[in-house]
Amino acid sequence: MSFDVYVMRVFGKSRGSWEAGMGVSAGLEVAAGSVASALAAQEGGAMRVELCHGLEGGGLTPSYGMLAVVRERLHIPLYVLIRPRGGDFVFSEEEMEVMCGDVECCVRLGCDGVVLGALDPAGEVDMGMMRVLIAAAGSLGVTFHRAIDVSADPGRTLEDVIALGCERVLTSGGRSSALEGAETIAALVAQAAGRVVVMPGAGVSAGNVLELRVRTGAHEFHASARSVVAARRLGAHPYIHDLGGDYDCTDADKVRQLVRLLSQGAS
């Protein structure tokens, strides 16, 4: 279905009329879990890369070596996920020290921004810890990540994120996918009123990005755009549990498709 037909079906108006109300072009950030994924995102036309490790578990801070190589080879903005472990987003003082060290590495390597978030045991934004991390980032841009999706009150969290001076917030609307959380995302976009970018993420694909754009009013979208890469068969040795199996990598063609769809909906 073309974007024109989709907008007419949902809103009963032409694309031109709808876009006059939107007024801002749309772009794609790609979550990349390897050097190859980051380069595929760039090749496919992504506007920005969020570099991380272990996307299967929600993402962790990438290694220094990966970060250094990607920074050298990437020519589009590079943001880096700062998350020292899986699980919740309530961090200890020692974990804060680790995160500060990782942020400082990003500064030294010339990254464009960091992606982080911290909550207190009550589910509120840990303003003290966030201020320390943001201070360590200096002039780098800051995205508040999906900690908002498990916070006590997403609307209040959004106001705290704005007060901290973050550029954007990544959210699935508190659901397992952005499509399921579209109503909440739309409410956050309306509440933000241009004070911060609200960026839908989680399950964003070519099959739903137009619907998400229309339903949420968002202008930036976050996707991994991955395909399975078949493992090389090394000799006659059988696989041992999960060792040596297939793996995921960002697919430049999937990125191109998303970028093309967003461009159609913004031009």
Curated annotation (Swiss-Prot):
Keyword list, A-Z: Cytoplasm
MF terms in GO: copper ion binding
Membrane-spanning segments: none
InterPro entries for this protein: CutC-like, CutC-like_dom_sf
GO cellular-component term (any): cytoplasm
Pfam family, one: CutC
Localisation per UniProt entry: Cytoplasm
Entry's family note: Belongs to the CutC family.
Listed name of the protein: PF03932 family protein CutC
